[in-house]
Amino acid sequence: MTTIDLNCDLGESFGAYKMGNDDKILPFVSSINVACGFHAGDPSVMRQTVEKAMQHNVAIGAHPGFPDLIGFGRRNMNVSASEIYDYVLYQIGALDAFVKAAGGKMQHVKPHGALYNMAATNPEIADAIAKAIYHINPSLLLYGLANSEAFIQAAEKYNITLVQEAFADRTYKQDGTLTSRTEENALIKNEEEAIKQVLQMVKEGYVNSVNGEKVAVQAQTICLHGDGEKAVQFAKRIYRTFEHNGISICAPK
């Protein structure tokens, strides 16, 4: 039986601001990426998100991003590899404290937004992220963009397991990278098209690029975004589509 992980970015609320549909999405995913306070989230939200994930038996990962609350971590920052190492180490450590306090165990690390996209094409940034993971806990998995040589090489260098990720509702360029969110066609807004893309990736191992060419994608985890208007409905659709097609949903081991 084909097996796939469904992951979602959660814990993005902070202070008086509520983001996402965390409670309603948790039953339909197998792993979550928890914002660690730099691009979103706050200490109370981190604790609450960890506790809810454990109640649903969902694998927990840190979702470190750039210190850019106003830009939601989606703007590139011109910082050194050393600074990125510090940012990532700090955020992993913060979430790990909440996970341990709740009696759980962190499974993975997935960079957020601009940090993720920059790491996918910049070996120096990917190396800094992998090094931070290695120094805090080398058994943590690294979620990174499928086919990214930067992520692959960094994981190999530090002997970290890379879980190759694809996106349900994002379009792809010919080189296998994601279309920038600054472009109008970055998101797939039609549910049927997104479902078709996910099944192609999981069952057939490819995705159609924005240019119409087939791009090989060997995904081990699929990302759902939890902050969209129809996020919960979409999560249910993918979950049930996988069940109907005999695809087992579970976190990576």
From Swiss-Prot:
CDD domains: LamB_YcsF_like. It comes from the Bacteria. One of its GO terms (biological process) is carbohydrate metabolic process. It is an enzyme of class 3 (hydrolase). GO terms for molecular function: 5-oxoprolinase (ATP-hydrolyzing) activity; ATP binding. Keywords: ATP-binding, Hydrolase, Nucleotide-binding. InterPro entries: Glyco_hydro/deAcase_b/a-brl (IPR011330), LamB/YcsF/PxpA-like (IPR005501). Its EC number is 3.5.2.9. Pfam families: LamB_YcsF (PF03746). It catalyses: 5-oxo-L-proline + ATP + 2 H2O = L-glutamate + ADP + phosphate + H(+). Forms a complex composed of PxpA, PxpB and PxpC. Catalyzes the cleavage of 5-oxoproline to form L-glutamate coupled to the hydrolysis of ATP to ADP and inorganic phosphate. Belongs to the LamB/PxpA family. This is 5-oxoprolinase subunit A. It comes from Bacillus thuringiensis subsp. konkukian (strain 97-27). The gene is pxpA.
